[in-house]
Amino acid sequence: MKIKNFKFKQVVSTNKTAIRIIKKTKLNYGMIISDLQRNGKGQHGKKWISYKGNLFLSFFFNINKIKIPINKITKINCLLVRKLISKFYKKNIIFKSPNDLLIKKKKI
């Protein structure tokens, strides 16, 4: 599986950009990366504060082709990201449910 990467200088939100690309291209997999996000989305309708220099990233994939219960996908994704980061950063990275990663008690 090859994931198509979309790189932007600035987006309203990586989530909204992913939705727009899915509708426009019909791709099954992709990754949105941006240098800045103006109006990010948190959980339960909360606003996500975005600071320049942070990582702004959304993955999208066709869940109809995945045989994992939808409620498990968020945790699996978070743990996969933790594993990836741990290859470059050797400090302890803590998973905090439902989808946060912490280093030294600070959300990353």
Predicted regions, residues:
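N-terminal lobe of the biotin/lipoate ligase/transferase fold
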Residues: 1-91, 107-108
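Catalytic palm active-site di-aspartate
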Residues: 92-105
